[in-house]
């Protein structure tokens, strides 16, 4: 599979669809952090692609092993097998999977998604753009893309970015997901840096920084593995300031339902669900209104 590299300069164009490209993903180096300690790339099992594993190992600058038995107990590894790329550690396994979201992006369900409602732009139609500044495994970005946004996904951790890139590439072959995935572009690097480099203002910036609070049982495995790579946001104010400085019409901040405001900044209004809350900051020129859950 061809991999398309895009310069970190001129990122304003990066929300455009990837029409006619062989891969669904464009990547850019924008100061991504190095891989976590004790990470190895492992190729194993029928259907595994040794060439893909070797390229991933080289890209991340980590050892390439043949079989999980070669990985030290307690160490994390990126497993490349016939199912794609997974992060494994101590019997836990994390793999991006957009297929399980197929029902949520159906037209009859998409409009009920709280994120889609929060990101809605009054009077907006086609050509809307968004930056998911804390992409993670890309589920929120997929919802926005399915809703018609061209989405730039920022992910600073190269291991999580590798999982996300694999998810996007696999989803590009899905009849259900391909149309949305064509509107998603991945940029590896610090989101504050990427937001500062944008040539054009997006309509929406989405923020969902790692939250250091308690873990729900359903999310525990995912959080445990991700938190071995990414720490909670260490400068919330800087992140919000960069998002606002990018000049969007709206900044949407995903928070735990009962969590505090990000950086202590009161939103213009919020949309609340049982588990999460979306706090919305509206640019003054587009009119603000106050509302709460």
Protein language model regions, located:
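S-adenosyl-L-methionine
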Residues: 2-5, 14-18, 26-128, 156-201, 293
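SAM/dcSAM-binding transferase cores
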Residues: 3-4, 15, 35-39, 221, ...
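Conserved proline-anchored active-site loop of SAM-dependent methyltransferases
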Residues: 130-143, 202-220
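Mobile active-site "lid"/loop adjacent to the S-adenosyl-L-methionine
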Residues: 209-239
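A short, acidic, amphipathic alpha-helical segment used as a generic capping/interface helix at domain edges
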Residues: 190-194, 231-244
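Conserved SAM-binding motif I beta-strand of class I
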Residues: 150-155
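Conserved Class I SAM-dependent methyltransferase catalytic core
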Residues: 236-282
């Amino acid at each position: 599979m061809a991999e398309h590299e895009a310069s970190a300069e001129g990122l304003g164009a990066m929300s455009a669809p990837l029409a006619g490209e062989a891969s669904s993903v464009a990547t850019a180096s924008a100061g991504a952090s190095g891989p976590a300690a004790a990470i190895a790339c492992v190729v194993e099992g029928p259907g595994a692609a040794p060439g893909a594993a070797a390229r991933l190992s080289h890209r991340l600058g980590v050892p390439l092993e043949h079989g999980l038995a070669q990985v030290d107990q307690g160490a994390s590894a990126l497993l490349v097998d016939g199912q794609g790329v997974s992060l494994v550690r101590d019997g836990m396994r994390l793999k991006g999977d957009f297929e399980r979201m197929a029902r949520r992006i159906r037209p009859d369900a998409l409009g009920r998604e709280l994120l889609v409602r929060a990101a809605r732009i009054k009077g907006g139609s086609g050509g809307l753009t968004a930056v998911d500044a804390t992409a993670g495994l890309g589920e929120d970005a997929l919802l926005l893309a399915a809703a018609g946004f061209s989405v730039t996904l920022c992910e600073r951790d190269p291991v999580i970015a590798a999982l996300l890139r694999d998810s996007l590439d696999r989803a590009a072959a899905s009849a259900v997901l391909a149309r949305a995935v064509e509107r998603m572009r991945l940029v590896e690097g610090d989101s504050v840096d990427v937001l500062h480099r944008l040539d054009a203002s997006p309509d929406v910036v989405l923020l969902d920084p790692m939250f250091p609070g308690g873990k729900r049982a359903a999310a525990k495995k995912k959080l445990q593995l991700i938190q071995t790579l990414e720490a909670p946001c260490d400068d919330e104010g800087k992140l919000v300031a960069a998002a606002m400085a990018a000049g969007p019409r709206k900044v949407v901040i995903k928070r735990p339902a009962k969590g505090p405001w990000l950086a202590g900044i009161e939103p213009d209004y919020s949309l609340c669900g049982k588990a999460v809350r979306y706090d919305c900051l509206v640019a003054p020129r587009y009119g603000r209104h106050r509302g709460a859950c």
